[in-house]
From Swiss-Prot:
Pfam families: CbiA, GATase_3. This is Cobyrinate a,c-diamide synthase. One of its GO terms (biological process) is cobalamin biosynthetic process. It catalyses: cob(II)yrinate + 2 L-glutamine + 2 ATP + 2 H2O = cob(II)yrinate a,c diamide + 2 L-glutamate + 2 ADP + 2 phosphate + 2 H(+). Pathway: Cofactor biosynthesis; adenosylcobalamin biosynthesis; cob(II)yrinate a,c-diamide from sirohydrochlorin (anaerobic route): step 10/10. The gene is cbiA.
Length: 467
C-alpha cells in the first residue's frame, strides 16, 4: 500500500554549508505554525538529531543504508513518519558525496529512494555570478532531477542577494525559496566530532526558537509546505522487514538498568532505547557529572559522548566512579560504548594531563589530535558471547580520537573487526568480568538481536561474559 507522506529532503552543494541550521530552523518554524514535524537524519550521527528533536518536540530518527539496509530504511521512515504533517530529512555531506563513484550511498540516492523533493542549500560566502554554474551543475548531474528549489545561505548583504538571485534566475530553471542572511549570533558551535550537542549548549531552546523565527522571516514556508505535499506516495517493498524498535513487548522478569544521560554521555539512538524497553528493560537515567548516588539497578549502560570535555569534572566525582568499580567487582553487568569504555578505564591521558577514572577496566586511554577510528565498521563475533554469532556480519560505526594505549591481563574480545579500527585494528568489544565495552556503536535496526541479548545479559547478571 503506498503511503502519502508530505516530505522534504535538505541537502547542500558541500559539507558545512548550513544544512543542519536550515533543517532545524525549518522544523522549528513549521512546528511553531502548529504542524507535526517528523525529523530524520541520514547517517549514523548522534549530534545533529538532538537539535532536530529539540526543534520538533519528538525524536529524530537515523536513516542509514550501510547499517540498516535500504528495505529497513524505507520501513523505518514510513513507520515513524505516520501521523506527522510533514517529514524533514537532513542529508549528510554534499548532495552527491559518498564513497561509491556511482553515488549509491549519496544523499541524492536516498532522496530518490524516499521520493523526497530536495531543497539545495548553497553557502553563498564570497559568491556572486559563479552561483549559477554551481547550481546548474547540480541540476544536470545524475540525481539532480530531485531538486525542487534553492535556499541561499550565509548571504552577507542585500546587494549580494540581488546579484545571486539575478544569476540564478537568468541561467538556472529552478526557484529560489529563500535567502538566509549571515548571523554569527545564532550559529551552532563545532568541535572535533561535529556540532556541539544541544544538551551542552546553554540556551539551546532559545537558539532553536530564534532559528525558527529566522526561517519564518526569510523562507517561503507556504511554498515549501506545498512542495512537500507534491511528494509521490511511497510504496514499501514486498514483505518489509520488521523493526526491532517496534517489536512486541517481551514478557519475563523486568530488569532495571541505569543509563548515563548527561552532558558527557548522550549518544543513544531512540530506536535502541525503545527496543530495550520492548525487551523488558526499565531504563533509569543517572548522571556521572553530579554527586548523587547511583540508582539501585541490576546493570549499567554507559553510551558515548564527550567525557574528554569533562575530564576534571569526572575526576572530582570520585564517589560515583568508585561505586561503579565496586559494583562491577561485585558482579554488576555493564555495557558501554566509546565514551563509556573510556570512563571505565583506569585513566585518560590528553594534552599531557592524566585523569584517574573508574578503573573498572585494566586499560589506559590516550587522546590523539587525529581520529583513531572513523567511519563504518564490520564486525563478527569471536565466539566469546552468544551474540553476535561468529558467522554473522554486523554493520556499525565508530568515531573516536581516543585509543587504548595500555591493555591489561585478563581482557578478552567479543568482536573481530573486518572493517574499521576498534580497539587494536583487529578486535573490539572488551570483555572483562561482567563488563562489555566497545568502540563500535550499534544500531538495533542493523543488529536486531542486540536488544534481546543485552536484556538477558543484564537480567542474568552478565553470566555470558564469564570465562
Amino acid at each position: 500500500m503506498p503511503y502519502r507522506i508530505p516530505r522534504l529532503f535538505i541537502s547542500a552543494t558541500r559539507k558545512s554549508s548550513g544544512k543542519t541550521f536550515i533543517a532545524v530552523g525549518l522544523t522549528a518554524a513549521l512546528s511553531a505554525r502548529g504542524l507535526v514535524v517528523q525529523p530524520f537524519k541520514k547517517g549514523p550521527d548522534y549530534i545533529d538529531p538532538r537539535w532536530h528533536s529539540l526543534a520538533a518536540g519528538r525524536e529524530c530518527r537515523n536513516l542509514d543504508d550501510f547499517i540498516m539496509g535500504r528495505p529497513k530504511v524505507l520501513t523505518s521512515f514510513v513507520a515513524h513518519a505516520q501521523g506527522a504533517d510533514v517529514a524533514i530529512i537532513e542529508g549528510n555531506l554534499g548532495l552527491f558525496d559518498g564513497q561509491d563513484l556511482e553515488g549509491s550511498d549519496s544523499s541524492a540516492a536516498l532522496a530518490k529512494a524516499l521520493g523526497a523533493p530536495v531543497l539545495l542549500v548553497v553557502d553563498c560566502k564570497h559568491l556572486a555570478r559563479s552561483v549559477a554554474p554551481l547550481v546548474c551543475g547540480h541540476l544536470h548531474f545524475p540525481g539532480g532531477e530531485t531538486i525542487v528549489g534553492i535556499i541561499l545561505n550565509n548571504v552577507a548583504t542585500p546587494r549580494q542577494e540581488k546579484r545571486l538571485r539575478e544569476a540564478i534566475e537568468r541561467f538556472c530553471p529552478i526557484p529560489i525559496l529563500g535567502a538566509i542572511p549571515r548571523s554569527a549570533e545564532i550559529m551552532i558551535d563545532e568541535r572535533h566530532l561535529g556540532l556541539v550537542p544541544a544538551n551542552e549548549k546553554q540556551g539551546a531552546p532559545h537558539t532553536v526558537e530564534t532559528m525558527g523565527r529566522m526561517m519564518e522571516s526569510h523562507l517561503d514556508l507556504d511554498r515549501l509546505v506545498a512542495l512537500a505535499a507534491t511528494a509521490t506516495p511511497l510504496a514499501l517493498p514486498d514483505n518489509p522487514p520488521a523493526l526491532a524498535s517496534k517489536a512486541p513487548l517481551v514478557g519475563g522478569r523486568p530488569v532495571r538498568v541505569g543509563y548515563a544521560a548527561d552532558q558527557a554521555f548522550s549518544f543513544y539512538y531512540p530506536d535502541n532505547l525503545e527496543a530495550l524497553r520492548q525487551n523488558g528493560v526499565e531504563l533509569v537515567p543517572f548522571s556521572l557529572l553530579d554527586e548523587q548516588p547511583l540508582p539501585q539497578v541490576d546493570g549499567l549502560y554507559i553510551g558515548g559522548g564527550f567525557p574528554e570535555m569533562f575530564m576534571e569534572h569526572l575526576q572530582q566525582n570520585r564517589a560515583t566512579l568508585e561505586t561503579i568499580r565496586t559494583r562491577s567487582e561485585l558482579g554488576m553487568p555493564i555495557y558501554a560504548e566509546c565514551g563509556g569504555l573510556m570512563v571505565l578505564s583506569q585513566r585518560l591521558i590528553w594534552a599531557g594531563k592524566r585523569v584517574e577514572l573508574a578503573g573498572a577496566l585494566p586499560i589506559e586511554i590516550t587522546m590523539h589530535p587525529k581520529p583513531q577510528g572513523y567511519g563504518y565498521m564490520k564486525i563478527h563475533g569471536t565466539g566469546a558471547l552468544p551474540w553476535p554469532p561468529v558467522d554473522q556480519e554486523i554493520c556499525c560505526h565508530e568515531f573516536h580520537y581516543s585509543k587504548v594505549s595500555k591493555l591489561g591481563e585478563g581482557v578478552r574480545f567479543a568482536y573481530q573487526v573486518t572493517r574499521g579500527s576498534g580497539v587494536d585494528g583487529w578486535h573490539d568489544g572488551i570483555l572483562y568480568h561482567n563488563i562489555f565495552a566497545s568502540y563500535a556503536h550499534i544500531h538495533v535496526e542493523g543488529a536486531p538481536e542486540w536488544a534481546p541479548f543485552l536484556a538477558r545479559f543484564w537480567r542474568e547478571r552478565g553470566s555470558f561474559s564469564q570465562p
